[in-house]
A protein has these predicted regions:
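Short polar/charged helix/loop
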Residues: 1-147
Length: 147
């Protein structure tokens, strides 16, 4: 795994940004948050995408509301629920967590963040999930940029 990040870091030095995909079943909450935070925090390090094996008609409204409040990001203006086949082939594929069933993406995941789905939970639970995703994005920046 660290070898993969080292190669991606070398490619970044040559001007090639790696593509990272954040995957969960419905692409409506955790993966959307990760895509939004990846774009906000790491757009100069990697390209962020999110997808699922199924889609929802809209992004989780609690996630939209809380991300707008915490980061000023309006996910409904910049993102939508997508299938895995709708995004470019990623260099790194990250599962958000399998508490709702792991989607099959045609290859093994490079990492599993093991995040519980906050859907239907309190704002405090959403905020904690968002903080965890934020920290994981910062770890990814370090792993890609400094490997």
């Amino acid at each position: 795994m660290s070898e993969r990040y080292r190669v991606l870091g070398e490619n970044l030095k040559c001007g090639e940004k790696p593509k990272l995909a954040f995957i969960c079943v419905h692409n409506s909450c955790r993966s959307q948050i990760a895509e939004a935070l990846g774009k906000k925090l790491a757009s100069d390090i990697f390209e962020s995408y999110s997808a699922g094996t199924e889609t929802k008609s809209q992004i989780n409204q609690d996630a939209v509301r809380i991300m707008k409040r915490l980061y000023g990001i309006d996910m409904e203006q910049t993102q939508y629920s997508k299938l895995i086949s709708d995004i470019p082939e990623p260099d790194i594929a990250i599962s958000m967590g399998c508490n709702v069933g792991c989607p099959f993406i045609g290859r093994p995941f490079d990492d599993n963040w093991g995040l519980d789905d906050p859907t239907g939970q309190s704002d405090a639970v959403f905020e904690e999930t968002i903080r965890k995703i934020h920290a994981k994005i910062l770890e990814l920046i370090f792993r890609v940029h400094f490997s």
